[in-house]
């Protein structure tokens, strides 16, 4: 399709619904009605797949279904692939993963951009359900060299805001929560590193302290490459799986699979 053809179809759709479906900006974004239409299309596509499986003659192309899912980088770097690998292979499913912080992933679903998401919020958007899968345990870690430089006499909480931290991105408030738990409410020095793997490598290199998933740092903790800056002060972050209520059999099966995997 040409750009002019796409523009014409959008105008025809807007004439039909009687209002704009797109905000003409850079980049463009859907209006509230546009988001409702996107959500509807997501659900209809999943329901169509159910029908094609029941009536194979309708599936002329025979292509795998693609699920667009928002999830946080730490889940992707640790447990996600192992949890869904067999399911995707057996169901012939491709995934289109959108990496967002666990605090904001739900915005993608509300905007109609994804069929499901993992996030830290329990409250689902309209037309969706949420399921608690469990919690990711984070520990505040640093390299022994970092601790020797910044805390030569031992850890002092009041000095933590003046030592470099590592933050995943502007929507990552985990370090803020940790500092608040120690009575520190002011701003703090920090690097920005939008990569879960890079976050861990920067911590290992002594560039700063950071909250790292326990799952991701087991080897480093066991070898002494990383240490807790303050012993036994973990933060548990709940993980909720959000999915459309009318998302079809495939999404329901994936939800059941994740529920069963989480129970193990």
Describe these PLM feature segments.
Residues 1-5, 9:
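Helix-turn-helix DNA-binding motif, specifically the short coil turn and the N-cap/start of the second
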Residues 110, 184-229:
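Hydrophobic hinge/microswitch elements
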Residues 63-126:
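Central regulatory/effector-binding core of bacterial HTH transcription factors
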Residues 12-32:
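A short LG(V/I)-centered, amphipathic sequence patch enriched
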Residues 231-264:
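A late-sequence structural motif
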Residues 128-166:
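Flexible hinge/capping segments at coil-to-helix
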Residues 16-17, 37-61, 258:
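Alpha-helical linker/hinge and terminal dimerization helices associated
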Residues 161-185:
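Secondary-structure junction motif
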């Amino acid at each position: 399709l040409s750009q002019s053809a796409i523009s014409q179809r959008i105008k025809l759709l807007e004439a039909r619904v009687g209002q704009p479906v797109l905000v003409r900006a850079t980049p463009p974004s859907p209006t509230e009605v546009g988001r409702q239409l996107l959500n509807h299309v997501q659900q209809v596509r999943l329901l169509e797949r159910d029908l094609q499986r029941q009536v194979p003659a309708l599936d002329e192309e025979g292509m795998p279904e693609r699920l667009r899912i928002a999830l946080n980088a730490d889940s992707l770097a640790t447990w996600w692939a192992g949890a869904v690998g067999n399911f995707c292979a057996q169901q012939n499913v491709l995934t289109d993963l959108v990496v967002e912080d666990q605090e904001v992933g739900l915005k993608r679903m509300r905007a109609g951009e994804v069929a499901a998401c993992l996030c830290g919020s329990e409250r689902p958007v309209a037309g969706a359900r949420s399921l608690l899968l469990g919690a990711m345990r984070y520990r505040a870690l640093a390299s022994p060299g970092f601790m020797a430089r910044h805390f030569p006499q031992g850890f002092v909480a009041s000095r933590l805001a003046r030592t470099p931290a590592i933050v995943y991105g502007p929507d990552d408030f985990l370090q803020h929560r940790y500092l608040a738990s120690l009575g520190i409410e002011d701003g703090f020095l920090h690097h920005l590193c939008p990569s879960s793997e890079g976050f861990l490598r920067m911590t290992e290199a002594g560039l700063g302290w950071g909250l790292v998933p326990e799952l991701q740092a087991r080897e480093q903790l066991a070898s002494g490459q990383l240490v807790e800056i303050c012993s036994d002060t973990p933060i548990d972050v709940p993980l909720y799986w959000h999915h459309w209520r009318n998302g079809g059999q495939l999404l329901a099966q994936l939800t059941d699979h994740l529920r069963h995997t989480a129970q193990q």
